[in-house]
From Swiss-Prot:
This is Elongation factor Tu. It comes from Corynebacterium glutamicum (strain ATCC 13032 / DSM 20300 / JCM 1318 / BCRC 11384 / CCUG 27702 / LMG 3730 / NBRC 12168 / NCIMB 10025 / NRRL B-2784 / 534). The lineage of its organism: Bacteria, Bacillati, Actinomycetota, Actinomycetes, Mycobacteriales. Residues 175-177 are annotated as: G5. Residues 83-86 are annotated as: G3. GTP binds at residues 19-26, 83-87, 138-141. Its main location: cytoplasm. Residues 138-141 are annotated as: G4. GTP hydrolase that promotes the GTP-dependent binding of aminoacyl-tRNA to the A-site of ribosomes during protein biosynthesis. Residues 62-66 are annotated as: G2. One of its GO terms (cellular component) is cytosol.
Amino acid sequence: MAKAKFERTKPHVNIGTIGHVDHGKTTTTAAITKVLADTYPELNEAFAFDSIDKAPEEKERGITINISHVEYQTEKRHYAHVDAPGHADYIKNMITGAAQMDGAILVVAATDGPMPQTREHVLLARQVGVPYILVALNKCDMVEDEEIIELVEMEVRELLAEQDYDEEAPIVHISALKALEGDEKWGKQILELMQACDDNIPDPVRETDKPFLMPIEDIFTITGRGTVVTGRVERGTLNVNDDVDIIGIKEKSTSTTVTGIEMFRKLLDSAEAGDNCGLLLRGIKREDVERGQVIVKPGAYTPHTEFEGSVYVLSKDEGGRHTPFFDNYRPQFYFRTTDVTGVVKLPEGTEMVMPGDNVDMSVTLIQPVAMDEGLRFAIREGSRTVGAGRVTKIIK
């Protein structure tokens, strides 16, 4: 029986709804699925509002996040859409990366205009690297006065510009509720919103197009053949006989050639992002490499020891710390496959960090780790996860 193959006929884009509580994020999500299911029944099924709103809990690195996933298609694209109903859920999702977003729909109620969480979500989207935001101005059926709508639009554009987002981004007037009720005029506006997503959210750069990178999980010696390292390819593609560097953890990097690639006990000519495989390395002894190092295309990545990160600290209920931590806190930072101890410097004016907080911090690691902006990590004390974060800036 052949496995059902994932059809790669259309570009796949991850998208999400962001915005202030009660401005209609979930209703907008439901309206999109309904209108697309009505318009392109052969491509889509509708998801009921309550199935989206009762978001299942997800465990991402031990942090409980309520998040719902729906998928839908336009004629041009296949979208996977995440909706995090609660504000805390949204923040946790953004920082821990339970769902990566290639673009976001910022939902703003025309009746309220931008509110504190609207601003906070846009700031977070910038910090975690969401590349594009467009706007759904919701509840437009409730505002008679055109001037009010124009004022709200101006405020939203200023907000986007503050965070270096496209000030000229489309702002589509919608009424998610009316569209859900089957109103034809407002249904058309949802289609316009999706057209704006198709036209303005850039096609994502897929992991396979980036330079090769594979974190080492395990190391074996095969008598008579040499050393094999195993792991999951994070980025790029690799062919047999390619040269690679082994970097991170140790002072010096090592160069070698991949003489064989094995997957599910079969020999392959190449490996690509997403594959779990073993690489046979020429002239490398078992003690030359260790878990936590990464195998990379020569010169494509560099190891670093100092960075700034945006971190969510687990609350006591989530299994995190029971007490705050202070400047010079020294936990382990778990990157990809290994822990490295680091020293935390808190931002000026922050005396301490409480469980349940999110904070921006600077970290100095005692060993170098191959990283770039956007890389995620967990913060651990022994085997217990106490926080999750992502690299926002490399210092050294």
